[in-house]
Amino acid sequence: MLFLLSELSGTLTPLNVFRYITFRTGGALFTAGFFVFWFGPWIISLLRLRQGKGQPIREDGPATHLTKRGTPTMGGLMILAGAVVSILLWTNPRNHYVWVTLAVTLGFGAIGFYDDYLKVTKQSHKGFSGRFRLLLEFAIAGAACLLISIYSPAGLQNQLAFPVFKDALLNLGWFWVPFAAFVIVGAGNAVNITDGLDGLAIVPVMIACGTFGVIAYLVGNSFTAGYLQVNYVRDTGELAVVCGAVIGAGLGFLWFNAPPAQIFMGDTGSLALGGLLGAIAVAAKHEIVLAIVGGLFVLEIMSVIIQVASFKLTGKRVFRMAPIHHHFEQKGWKEPQVVIRFWIIAVILALVGLATLKLR
């Protein structure tokens, strides 16, 4: 919204600053962070009052987790509120990619909210039907990908770009929309599964958002895209502002989610943030790079898939417990060790992902 002030720069020259993506990204980060930090205590108190027993804790999980009983969930509401307010304030309201990304984020957030609501009210780990949940996610992601395909440059519609290889594009044709929808749904559920320890998911999400904020900015600028020899995707630079807002909201949330957590993100936040990352990667034509940058999330969801498949096929478990962060807890790692070491992995993978921009 503030972007529109730049149109008055002919009369008031200082207003031209609102034209710059870098300035608005910084503004979005600060605004979202301040919003969550300021309203966080009130939201936590309200959720604690409404939820009573809070998020149910797995009885078969690590014994140390039993002390977390009574901690409220749905903290994703804090993140989404701060991020959305900031995004609406600082982005260009005429940008299609911003609205599509917001739709995915809020749609996935609504699904996660309902799932959290059922878990809290029933005091059970089972929300609503997994198949129905996936159906809703694919419906939202499919519609978003169809719009992204329409808004994409003519030469890049339905194309899958490969990192490192110059001008390497694979025309997926009609299959691109379901493929891209799978990327978004997969990202949403991968982040959702990662969110099992205090601070474990939110920091890698912020790292991934920072990385894709840079990627979106570079591929959305014709000069930098040409210099790096990557595909120029017009208007995606505005998604850097979205990433800035999410990072700010994430920092505000981390203040309250740092161990011992005062609130959990819940499916409300994790599903929404994962969907957001997937949507940005799809819009910027860097779907494969998302698997690198978000490699930690891939590892987490693959550990669950492997565990379930192995048990059904052989009756044996590969890991002591899945997702894999619980496996390391069962091996004797303390929760802070698991969290910080996984953060380190996330930073390394983000750097590798950024390096693919230069390697051509």
Curated annotation (Swiss-Prot):
It catalyses: UDP-N-acetyl-alpha-D-muramoyl-L-alanyl-gamma-D-glutamyl-meso-2,6-diaminopimeloyl-D-alanyl-D-alanine + di-trans,octa-cis-undecaprenyl phosphate = di-trans,octa-cis-undecaprenyl diphospho-N-acetyl-alpha-D-muramoyl-L-alanyl-D-glutamyl-meso-2,6-diaminopimeloyl-D-alanyl-D-alanine + UMP. Keywords: Cell cycle, Cell division, Cell inner membrane, Cell membrane, Cell shape, Cell wall biogenesis/degradation, Magnesium, Membrane, Metal-binding, Peptidoglycan synthesis, Transferase, Transmembrane, Transmembrane helix. It is a multi-pass membrane protein. Belongs to the glycosyltransferase 4 family. MraY subfamily. The keyword Ribonucleoprotein does not apply. One of its GO terms (biological process) is regulation of cell shape. It is found in: Cell inner membrane. Catalyzes the initial step of the lipid cycle reactions in the biosynthesis of the cell wall peptidoglycan: transfers peptidoglycan precursor phospho-MurNAc-pentapeptide from UDP-MurNAc-pentapeptide onto the lipid carrier undecaprenyl phosphate, yielding undecaprenyl-pyrophosphoryl-MurNAc-pentapeptide, known as lipid I. GO terms for cellular component: plasma membrane. Its EC number is 2.7.8.13. This is Phospho-N-acetylmuramoyl-pentapeptide-transferase. Its cofactor is Mg(2+). InterPro entries: Glycosyl_transferase_4, PNAcMuramoyl-5peptid_Trfase, PNAcMuramoyl-5peptid_Trfase_CS. Pathway: Cell wall biogenesis; peptidoglycan biosynthesis. One of its GO terms (molecular function) is phospho-N-acetylmuramoyl-pentapeptide-transferase activity.
